[in-house]
């Protein structure tokens, strides 16, 4: 019930709600999702047609045997192998089923709305916001619907002609030092190196900027086909953030996520 109270709290956004239900009810998908849906390849057979890197890297295979700092990492032989593997996720989703379903996008929009509506108390609407690993851009779209006009996304593979997300690497941002007001990601389990990624995100944030991560829970059984790292305890990730940031603004746990908002990067 608390989820729905948050969902329908004050300050409604008509544009957000209209687009949310268009995503749910439009046959064949709405907006950019419709373009992705058209890319479904009914002749594609995964076991026959999958990329060679997927023979090594899948849900149960391609992982290192030992843990490091509470983390299990994929056994990539090079950064190029990592990039190749990560770029395949969207391609496979589109070929096999046309990307996310209408209900998936509807559900993601509601979850992002609950997350991001809190930000209006902390940031001006012209804040510089970067969403890392944004794929088709649902989180960017919701931020803009909430009034954050300078929200943008990056992804290794954002799909063709994506109006919301540019090609970019969350491990190696193009953004200058001290330039972002907020950085958001819900794909930190796709990092090549978690500590290096946090340091890179900290670098690009302004001294009093915010970092918002969705941290996957219930990962004791390991990651899925495309996760690059997994952890048994979310605390191991949160502690890494506390070493880099001065203040925890908010922590909230959901069934699949622990979302953590921190502010104020530590001086090196």
What would you call each of these model-derived segments?
Residues 208-218:
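Conserved beta-strand signature within the Rossmann-like core of class I S-adenosyl-L-methionine
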Residues 181-194:
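A short SAM/SAH-binding and catalytic strip from SAM-dependent methyltransferases
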Residues 171-183:
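A short acidic, Gly/Pro-enriched loop at the edge of an enzyme's catalytic core
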Residues 41-124:
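Class I SAM-dependent methyltransferase Rossmann-like catalytic core
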Residues 195-210:
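A short glycine-rich, Lys/Arg-flanked "PGG" loop and its adjoining helix->strand segment in the class I
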Residues 218, 223-252:
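Conserved Class I S-adenosyl-L-methionine
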Residues 246-268:
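Core SAM-dependent methyltransferase catalytic element
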Residues 128-172:
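Class I SAM-dependent methyltransferase SAM/SAH-binding core
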